[in-house]
Amino acid sequence: MMSFVSLLLVGILFHATQAEQLTKCEVFRELKDLKGYGGVSLPEWVCTTFHTSGYDTQAIVQNNDSTEYGLFQINNKIWCKDDQNPHSSDICNISCDKFLDDDLTDDIMCVKKILDKVGINYWLAHKALCSEKLDQWLCEKL
C-alpha cells in the first residue's frame, strides 16, 4: 500500500511540474491575442518564446542586477516589481511573480506595453533566430 501511495505522489508531482511546460501548439493557441500586434506574427512569437524560455511559464533567469520572469522573460528592472528590485519602473504595474503562472493574460498585457514602448527587439532571440524561415513554428492543430 505504501509503494502505491508513493507512486501516486510521484505521478501527481511529476504532472504538477510539467504543467508549466507548454507545447508549441499550446503556445500558438495561447498567444492568439498577439497575432499581428506590433507587426509580429504568431510563428514569430512561438519561435521567440521557445528561444527565450523554452515554453516554460515558470522560467526565471537571474542576471547581475536583474531577473527575468516567465514565458516571455519579462525583466524586473523596468516592467514588473519584486523584492530584488523595489525601485523598478514597474511600467506594467504588476508583481513579477504573476508571470510565473499558467494564466498568460497578464503576461500578454505587459508584452503589448513592451511592444508599444520598445518593439519586438526587446527579445534578442527574435532578430537573431525568429525573423525568417518560420514554417517550423506553425501549428496545424488549431
Swiss-Prot record:
The gene is LALBA. It comes from Bos mutus grunniens. Keywords: Calcium, Disulfide bond, Glycoprotein, Lactose biosynthesis, Metal-binding, Milk protein, Secreted, Signal. PANTHER family: ALPHA-LACTALBUMIN, LYSOZYME C. The keyword S-adenosyl-L-methionine does not apply. Transmembrane segments: none annotated. Coiled coil: none annotated. Disulfide bonds join 25-139, 47-130, 80-96, 92-110. It comes from the Eukaryota. Residues 20-142 form the C-type lysozyme domain. Regulatory subunit of lactose synthase, changes the substrate specificity of galactosyltransferase in the mammary gland making glucose a good acceptor substrate for this enzyme. This enables LS to synthesize lactose, the major carbohydrate component of milk. In other tissues, galactosyltransferase transfers galactose onto the N-acetylglucosamine of the oligosaccharide chains in glycoproteins. It is found in: Secreted. PROSITE patterns: GLYCOSYL_HYDROL_F22_1 (PS00128), GLYCOSYL_HYDROL_F22_2 (PS51348). This is Alpha-lactalbumin. Glycans are attached at residues 64, 93.
